[in-house]
Amino acid sequence: PFAGEGTVFNPIAGMDEPYYYRNKVTSPYVPGRKTKGGKRPQGKKGNAGAKGAPQHEILCGMYAAGTHRVINTDSCLLENKDAKQAVLAIRSLMQRYHMEPYNEDANTGFIRHAVIRVGHTTGELLVTVVTNGKEFPASRNFCRELKKRCPAITTVVQNVNTRQTNVILGDEGEKTLYGPGFIIDELCGLTFRISSHSFYQVNATQTEVLYRKAIEMAHFTGTETAMDAYCGTGTIGLVAAKGLPGAETAHAARVIGVDNVASAIKDARENARHNGIENADFTAEDAGQFMDKLAKEGESLDVLLMDPPRAGSNEQFLRSACSLAPKRIVYISCNPNTQARDVEYLVKHGYRLTEVQPVDMFPHTNHVENICALELQ
């Protein structure tokens, strides 16, 4: 009901080689069948370095849909091969160093999860080992052996999570066991620092497609003030500030990034600094409240870039956006249902939907990322 005769609906932008694309791989480690002659390692939580072999075989891989049952997998056509190799190497080293896998029901065991991040262009690997306790006595040998088995690894981080929960990363502290504690990747001609908590798209190839199309839809000429709402670590905002490789004149004069996650804003500022970008500022604040404040202060905005979470935006944000009345809105969404709801609101309040571009960010799944471009009538 909100698309007009002139709205352009582009075909889905697919991926040429839709395999091994996931640059973030997460695996739980859980006990499987009992092993013959196995005895519980010393210490109530089966900590690293204890004597004795694990009581159970160790399962790692992925959860069956809608369950907590782990499907033991040695390979996956969607996961980066080096990342998968690291997951399996950790399982092997757990057996060697007598580290018990985590039992969620009993809250026992030592190794809970591994989260592997891969730099698509650099090939660097960040391994985050989530442990049920701070003590990691064999950490130096563990890291040395892990690096031997997976030479692409450039850093290893320990994340502590002792809570009886299925939340993966804990908030009880992190320790860098090897390397700098982060990796570097390149996207649209910019470099980005990725740590264990950083948000970063899991398909770098299609992210380039997504961002290029979004920047093109913004029609930057070098004079605009743009806002990157729900900016995360600032990726698309920084691309807007600098311009795409080969088309650097098509950029915003000034970019304001806003997100309510303080650690993401810290990363965004650091990303701006090491890319030498001085025309982008980032603020840790609720996007809706920030927009409301700008509207009340009489600020003007030419282009609004927005990439909200799956739940979509909210009426406060959309109302403030309409008050600021940017000439163009480029709305990126991982949930076309909530995007349609929000776009309908914008169309009812003075905007025209001009173009729609779906991008297949997750081949072989039913998920699609969608970009909508709107212009003020």
Where do the model's predicted regions map?
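Rossmann-like S-adenosyl-L-methionine
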Residues: 138-377
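Short, aliphatic-rich beta-strand segments
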Residues: 116, 123-132, 191-195
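Short, solvent-exposed loop/turn elements at beta->coil junctions and helix N-caps
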Residues: 10-18, 104-105, 111-113, 117, ...
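A short, glycine/Asx- and small/polar-enriched loop/turn
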Residues: 19-23, 123-124, 366-369
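Extended interfacial segments that mediate partner engagement and assembly in macromolecular machines
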Residues: 1-101, 136
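Short, acidic/hydrophobic/Gly-rich beta-strand patch recurrent on exposed beta strands
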Residues: 61-64, 128-130, 268
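Short beta-strand elements
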Residues: 20-33, 56-64, 116-118, 175, ...
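Auxiliary alpha/beta "docking" domains used to position bulky ligands
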Residues: 72, 79, 121, 140, ...
